[in-house]
């Protein structure tokens, strides 16, 4: 299983070109907006889910019976779930528990406390990170982009699995 350039193009078309402003603005608040986006997103994958002839793609393979409906349904469903509940923010928050945060106090050489650590601090609670998965110590623009990148990784992984195994 791997992501092909074709798959990445379909993903970009579905998530950035075909998605309307209304879908983008409301998909985390409204299931109808999330569903409209997920369906339009999945439709971008039709060329990759159609049967291929030994000579490559052919218009005759656009018959409904030749479409891998299970792959399209999986792509649509996972896209709906990931976007509707903005699952990437949970992953961004949870990953910070893989290694606890440590504060190191830097004192000038010769100071009696030089080289000593202040100790461990707990990770930020969900209430401080629920928007993007990152707390306020991360610049807002960076927190949003890191969440978008994580979101894209989840979509590409789900799509690759669907195209490889369904």
Residue ranges and their predicted role:
Residues 1-166:
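Hydrophobic alpha-helical transmembrane segments
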């Amino acid at each position: 299983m791997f992501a092909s350039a074709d798959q990445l193009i379909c993903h970009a078309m579905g998530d950035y070109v075909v998605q309307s402003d209304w879908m983008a603005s409301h998909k985390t608040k409204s299931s109808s907006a999330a569903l409209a986006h997920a369906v339009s997103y999945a439709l971008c994958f039709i060329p990759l889910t159609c049967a291929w002839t030994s000579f490559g793609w052919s218009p005759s393979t656009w018959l409904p019976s030749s479409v891998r409906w299970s792959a399209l349904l999986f792509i649509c469903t996972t896209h709906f779930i990931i976007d509707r509940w903005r699952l990437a923010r949970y992953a961004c928050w949870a990953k910070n528990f893989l290694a606890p945060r440590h504060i190191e106090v830097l004192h000038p050489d010769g100071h009696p406390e030089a080289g000593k650590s202040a100790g461990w601090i707990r990770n930020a609670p969900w209430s401080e990170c629920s928007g993007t998965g990152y707390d306020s110590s991360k610049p807002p623009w960076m927190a949003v982009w890191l969440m978008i990148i994580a979101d894209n990784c989840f979509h590409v992984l789900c799509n690759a699995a669907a195209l490889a195994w369904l």
